[in-house]
Amino acid sequence: MAYKKPGFLGKKPVPHGKGAGRDPYVRDDSPRLTAPRREQPQPLQRNKRLGELLIDRFSHDGRGLASLDGKTLFVDGAIAGETVTARLLEDHPRFAEARVEDVILASPDRVEPPCAHYATCGGCQLQHLKPEAQLLMKQQVVLEQVHRWGGLTPKRVLPPLRSESLGYRSRARLGVWYEADSSVTLGFRQQQRKTLTNIESCSVLLPALNRLIGPLRQWLQARVANKAVTHIELVAAQSGPAVIVRHTKPLVALQRQALAELAQRESCQVWLEPNGNQGLTDLEGSPVDPHLVLDVAGLPLHFHPQDFTQVNPAVNGRMVQQALELLAPGTNDLVLDFFCGMGNFTLPMASRVARVIGLEVVEPMVTRAQANATRLGLDNLEFLKADLSQMDSPRLRQLCSQASAILLDPPRDGAKELVTQLRDLRRKGQLSAQRIVYVSCNPATLARDAALLAEAGYGLDALGVMDMFPHTSHVESMALFLYKQ
């Protein structure tokens, strides 16, 4: 649009007399002297078919990245180096999202997805990519994040920890939806949608859980008129599979009887979870507090079916072993395990050190961890409930001044408050740890916290990925920081 000099009405009147110096009154309907208007790009039409796209690289979440009209385009199902066409999903002010429609020039890393539901199910994002290429992509994501946001490069890159890419997952939560034709949908959310994908099986579930999907669907279908069940959770343990049925209305006697028969026929345990977070009950509605058994580094740990546990037992065992090797504790050392949960690292560590303290904000997990320690006869460890965003407790400060090593295993938000306080303690000479192992489930928060540790004088010695969730975009990693003398 050409810029035109404004007419007389667009000029400000010259102030005179008593009102001079004040902002003059300008009629609201008069033209104003403004900068030339920029033509705003029109938003792209949703579901529009886009032309050929060259996928430049991977994004942090495993999508392909391309350029479209000056915007960054995130393309689901695309691989770096490919030429594809795609359908637009969403157009945002600074970026757009699309999904592959046709692959014109395929990457040698592209494979046929092993799951029949992959095209619609949102549970997995990377089944079109070779497992080896998935690992490489995840490793690059972590290295790029810590370099870009933390300004750090590890001295050495650890070999990736991995398991079988299929049949590894020990826990899943399935949604239930009742269709207008009286059929039942049982499955996971669809990609980019809130609706469910009806699945016959799940290729990443452990076989003991996978075989329960069909019988559970039949049970739901036989009593569809009740429409009481909203979710079904599957959990695997050493003692066998377990099922948790969440319901919003009481189950009728016939439903409960059929569920009891299913449990006996399929050799699984079944509990109910009434609506309202009231805990678990048995099939008769009586409250129960069950436990299952999980093997961690050779130790049988008891856990509640709803406790947080790592979903990949094989990688979890290797992760614990690697953490202990990186910490390299001596038999006379004190080690602190922050965000210890039910003692996934703390309990296996007890046999290697003089003393280990697990710190956790969730009180039921502290209780569970201490009960496991007592049952296993481990008396050189202690579990404490603590607000890990505050280090003003004299006991915590004393422990920090005595510990020779620290392990951090925070949630996705990372440990900014805790690491900031550890940095400040180190600057005051009140933190003695020479080695810090950081277990991360979010490369971005790892990078941020790594920069804080660097400010405290800790160098990034080693970094590696752990493929806890093959075929998904989730990235787990482990880093070793050493204090620079």
Swiss-Prot record:
Binding site for S-adenosyl-L-methionine: Q310, F339, N344, E360, D387, D409
EC number(s) per entry: 2.1.1.190
A single MF term (Gene Ontology): 4 iron, 4 sulfur cluster binding
Region feature (Disordered): 1-48
Catalytic activity annotation: uridine(1939) in 23S rRNA + S-adenosyl-L-methionine = 5-methyluridine(1939) in 23S rRNA + S-adenosyl-L-homocysteine + H(+)
Biased composition (Basic and acidic residues): 20-40
Binding site for [4Fe-4S] cluster: C115, C121, C124, C202
Residues annotated as the enzyme's active site: C441 (nucleophile)
Keywords assigned: 4Fe-4S, Iron, Iron-sulfur, Metal-binding, Methyltransferase, rRNA processing, S-adenosyl-L-methionine, Transferase
Keyword Transmembrane: no
Entry's Gene Ontology BP terms: rRNA base methylation
Source species, domain of life: Bacteria
Alphabetized InterPro entries for the sequence: 23S_rRNA_MeTrfase_RlmD (IPR001566), MeTrfase_TrmA_CS (IPR030391), NA-bd_OB-fold (IPR012340), SAM-dependent_MTases_sf (IPR029063), TRAM_dom (IPR002792), U5_MeTrfase_fam (IPR010280)
All residue ranges annotated as the TRAM domain in the record: 43-102
Enzyme class: transferase
Family: Belongs to the class I-like SAM-binding methyltransferase superfamily. RNA M5U methyltransferase family. RlmD subfamily.
Role, per record: Catalyzes the formation of 5-methyl-uridine at position 1939 (m5U1939) in 23S rRNA.
Name of the protein described by the UniProt record: 23S rRNA (uracil(1939)-C(5))-methyltransferase RlmD
Naturally occurring in which organism (per UniProt): Cellvibrio japonicus (strain Ueda107) (Pseudomonas fluorescens subsp. cellulosa)
